[in-house]
A protein has these predicted regions:
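Start-transfer (signal-anchor) and selected internal transmembrane alpha helices
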Residues: 1-27, 111, 117-118, 126-128
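Transmembrane signal-anchor helices characteristic of membrane glycosylation enzymes that use polyprenol
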Residues: 9-44, 52-54, 98, 102-105, ...
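Short helix- or helix-capping micro-motifs
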Residues: 21, 129-137, 176, 180
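Extracytosolic helix-loop segments that constitute the early lumenal/periplasmic catalytic or substrate-binding loops
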Residues: 38-65, 69, 77-87
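Transmembrane-helix motifs of polytopic, lipid-linked glycan transferases
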Residues: 95-120
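Specific aromatic-rich, kink-prone transmembrane helix
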Residues: 111-114, 136, 152-169
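Short acidic/glycine- and proline-prone juxtamembrane loop motifs at membrane-interface regions
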Residues: 144-150
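Perimembrane helix-loop-helix junctions
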Residues: 188-204
Length: 204
């Protein structure tokens, strides 16, 4: 079979995996309640930002322990809920909260597939790794069941280190800033970036 035909078939298979991965996460999101503490925070933060605007969000005495990078997404979700009269803790509201992290998970799956394909070609190992990333129980639990937003900061963080490997230092640093603006846990990767970035620049 010509290599171009194989590549087209594999690209179609990748799209099927991506769509299925997002669909599974959204079905889980609709069917489960999520982690109640974080769910209530996400809903309240979105409502506050949507109604009061960014200038009044970090107000004295108001609990908000997330940086501002992801808050506009929560505000957009709040706006959609108000527009269509959707309850935040209902199935549709939960799907809206899980939508962006699920799409970011799909972006991570595509990135893993592209890296694996460069290293291993159009092989069974490449698709096994892609499938594992798509349906890893940890990712499904985090995004689909708990409704966490980790996918939204893991994607730019993974892209950051991929760009570092390819010696594209400025875009890598910018993407690390994006990840850090979404969730402070990106600081855990800071030491690695602090070593890799200066070493790469010096080697260049």
């Amino acid at each position: 079979m010509p290599s171009r035909t194989i590549q087209k078939q594999n690209n179609r298979a990748l799209w099927v995996i991506l769509i299925a991965a997002v669909a599974v996460r959204l079905v889980l999101a609709a069917a489960t309640a999520g982690y109640p503490y974080d769910m209530s925070c996400f809903i309240a933060w979105g409502d506050k930002l949507f109604t009061e605007g960014p200038a009044n969000f970090y107000s004295e005495g108001y609990f908000a322990d997330y940086p501002p990078g992801y808050l506009p997404v929560l505000a957009a979700v709040a706006g959609l809920r108000k527009l269509f009269g959707v309850a935040g803790d209902g199935p549709v509201g939960r799907v809206l909260l899980a939508l962006v992290p699920s799409v970011c998970d799909a972006g991570l799956i595509a990135l893993v597939h592209c890296i694996a394909r460069r290293r291993m070609g159009e092989s069974r190992q490449t698709f096994c790794l892609t499938l594992f990333t798509a349906f890893c129980p940890l990712f499904l639990f985090d995004t689909g069941l708990w409704k966490q937003i980790d996918g939204a900061f893991v994607l730019p963080l993974a892209l950051c280190f991929w760009l570092l490997e390819n010696r594209r230092y400025l875009p890598a640093a910018l993407l690390y800033g994006v990840a850090l603006s979404i969730k402070p846990q990106a600081l855990l990767a800071g030491p690695g970036l602090a070593v890799c970035l200066p070493a790469g620049v010096a080697a260049a």
